Design a protein with these regions (language model features):
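Nucleotidyltransferase catalytic core that binds NTPs
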Residues: 1-140
């Protein structure tokens, strides 16, 4: 959808949002390289710029020739890095709807649940020793 609104799609990829927003954002599960490769595989992405901090992102916004900035609709009524700069400099803000229910928080929750189930299954398959055997083992 975004590519229909622009000629050149530049994607900014943050290394780790917890660097300057700990406790607010989640640490990425995948490495920056893995995420970069996934973006690179998308036929609509023309260029990927990697940045570390929100300050770095603002510098990218200020130094690139941008006409439109795409954000998730969850940012519509929030303040965010570069919002005022975009408004002041005629960079259109386009808020897109999330067409899916995937999120890193939900993925973490599912992964933790499955890992917990796996650990419980493993523990339940361990042989249970009698208290007499446990006592004998402790005497050695």
């Amino acid at each position: 959808m975004e590519k229909q609104l622009c000629d050149y799609l530049l994607v900014a990829l943050q290394v780790d949002p917890t660097i300057d927003r700990p406790g607010i954002k989640n640490k990425p599960i995948q490495s920056v390289y893995e995420r970069y490769v996934q973006l690179q595989a998308c036929k609509y992405v023309d260029e990927i710029l990697v940045y570390e901090t929100e300050y770095d992102l603002l510098q990218l916004i200020k130094t690139q020739t941008l006409h439109i900035r795409f954000l998730s609709e969850e940012y519509m009524n929030r303040d965010f890095t570069g919002k005022q700069y975009c408004i002041d400099n005629g960079i259109e803000l386009h808020y897109h709807k999330r067409q899916h229910n995937y999120s890193s928080s939900e993925l973490r929750s599912r992964t933790a649940k499955l890992e917990n189930m796996k650990n419980q299954e493993f523990t339940s398959t361990l042989p249970q020793h009698s208290s007499e055997l446990a006592y004998k083992m402790s005497e050695k």
